[in-house]
Every structure is written in structure tokens, then in C-alpha cells.
Amino acid sequence: VLDAPTAADAMDLLTQTLRATGLTTELSRALVPWRKQFARHDPGKILTDLALMLAVGGDCLADVATLRAEPAVYGPVASDPTISRLLTALAADVDKAESAISTARRKARKNAWAEAGHHAPNANATAKNPLVIDLDATLVTAHSDKQSAAGNYKGGYGFHPMTAFIDHGPGATGEAGTILLRPGNAGSNTATDHITTTQQSLAQIPDLPPRPGRKILIRTDSAGATHDFLDYLHKQGWATR
């Protein structure tokens, strides 16, 4: 558990990261169609506030009050009803909203990797030193009824998202490429979900050539060892492990 000074420093680092990568700005541009004419709060700022809320340990929308209590650090934070209205508006056209948000994330990631220079995950990627994308499904417990929550194969209840993380190499961690939301009863070895997650994660890679070949390595556990998924990867010419 972080003490108060350490937590404050960590959150200051995150807010500076948002500014340095331009994520809030890119989201604001992408979400212009969802901004009301006389709105006080920007949709891009609202979404990054929700991300920060999760980083400080929140697990529901009401926990954004943690940020609202520190305006000197986080700036003006929208009220719960305003946040709820934005999410309702985004949910009215999920495909369009997800596409806009994904585009903003890709642009911000490009900014971040440009700043990282030769430390960026895609710097000097070769067949012998490929950019690695890790795929894995993970169980997320829901303690009460939620939209799309369902029983899972381990006897639990909740969600079963498929995740794709871009590996940062030896001695480092990684970053989320994409997370495919799925109900708890989704299969671990569903080939179509593996393919969709792979495609969405590759769409997040800045300046990726149309046929990167073995400069990309897709790494997964045995759940990804289905004929359909492996056939798809081999047709693309990507390395697998």
C-alpha cells in the first residue's frame, strides 16, 4: 500500500504522462461528435479521469470523487450525472465510439514511442528480435449482477476478457495493446476472439508496415493453439510461440 506522499507523486507522474503523450488532447479531438455545444466538461478529459480513478484504486464510477477532492492535481472533474450521460451517449453507438477512442490511443502511443526513441518496443524490430505481443484470457470476478456477467468454467461469476499486451523486453514490463470485452462464459480457446484481439492490438502499433512478417511475434498459452488461429497467423507470416 502506498503512503500518501508516494501515492501523490505517482499520480502526478500519471497526469504528466497524459500531457506528454497528448492522450487527453487526442481523445478530445476524437470525441468531438459527443461533446454538447455548451458542455463545461470535455469528453476526453472525462475518460482520462476515469482511467486515473482506476489507477488510484477505484472500482466504480462513484470513486471518481477521489479525484474531485484534489482539483489542484486533477483539475475540474465532472459530476457523476455528467459522466453517466457521456457513457450513455458513447454506448448508443459502440462501434463508432470504440473506433474513435482506439484512434486516439494509437496517436498517443505514437507520441510516447517517438519520445522513447531507441527504447520504444518497435525500435529496431527484426526477425531475430521481434516485437512481442502476448495474448491471454483472464477471469474478472463480479460480486453482483452486471451487464454481460456470466458463470465461468471455474465455477465463478463475472467476465472473461481477452487481453493483448505489448512486451517491453527483458528487464521491463509491457503495455496494454487492447482488451476484448467478453462475458464470463466465453471460451478460453475461441479462435475468432484470438484473431480479433490480434488484429486490434496490431492496429495500435505505430507505423506498422502492411506485411511486417516475423518482426512481429504473437505469444500465447495453449488456449491459442487452435488450428484456425494458427492457420491465420501463418497466413500473415508472423512468428508464433
PLM feature segments, named:
Residues S201-Q204, R219, F229:
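Short, hydrophobic/aromatic alpha-helical segments in well-folded domains
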Residues D136, R214-A225:
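Acidic/histidine-rich, metal-coordinating catalytic segments
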Residues L230-A239:
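Short, surface-exposed basic-aromatic patches at helix termini and helix-loop junctions that form
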Residues A142, A225-H227:
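Conserved protein kinase catalytic core
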Residues P130-D134, K215-L217, A239-R241:
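Structural preference for beta-strand elements that scaffold enzyme active sites
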Residues V1-G187, T192-R211:
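Dynamic "connector" segments at or just before major functional cores
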